[in-house]
Amino acid sequence: MRFGIPLGLVRPDAWHDLAVAADELGFDSVWLPEHLVLATGGGMQGYPGGRAPIRPSTPLYDAPVRLAALAAATRRVRLGTAVYLLGLRHPLISARAFATLDEIAGGRTVLGAGAGWYRAEWDAVGAPFAERGGRLDEAIGVLRRLWSEEAVAHGGPHFPFPEVAFEPKPPRRAVPILIGGESPAALSRAARNDGWISMPAPPERVAGAAAELRRLRAEAGREGEPFEVVAHAEGGCRPDETAAWTAAGVHTLIVRPWRRGRDALAAAERFARDHGLAPGAPSDRARPARPAS
């Protein structure tokens, strides 16, 4: 089992030290959430699965920029978004942001994407909330082409553009795209891409979704292709609980083994010790060779 750390659940001024510790302790990944804006009206709602409304004063950051800073401070740990709202932005902008991040990170980026649930963001940028799924699908297709083809023109309904060149490509000429969410549409979208990210949930609920993903991928003839299931635990994970997550089909478990954010660093150290984590060599995810330009 690989373990990840949700940086968004501690204060931003702790992200650097916690990410560096995760890198040194043997965690697999660190993850940042993403929102563009928060409404100030009385209709503010909480994160699905959460218990309290999100405060409008909550600080928000550009996730690829913050992850790039963490990439420069780490050597091995993967850097992911959970999740990034691709459909809110033109894919040329997102493609550039994540290609730049992945260049700095040496191929350690994971793009977790979602259609979104918070309508106020869409209203703020003038994008139709009802079209968020189609915009996400179209954006994903554009990103994959920009990262792999020499020149790209796109005629889709949401983001048409004339032929352009896009350089540099990401080190792998791709960035893994995982889809977050538990709706039928989200699972179907995840099955067409590189992986799935759960909401905070117990292993038995994740197991049901993972089984459905296996069915969807088998129907599409993709069961032999790489696919990552990332689950959010509802808190930590004791060593004797790991087997249940493995049986549920989880490859990477995002854990929060602390009750208070100020205890996160010490809790991560205890977690790594209890689970026998050990850092892998930085070359495990070294930058692949690229032809000279």
What is the predicted role of each segment?
Residues 1-293:
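Active-site-adjacent structural elements that line small-molecule/cofactor binding pockets in enzymes
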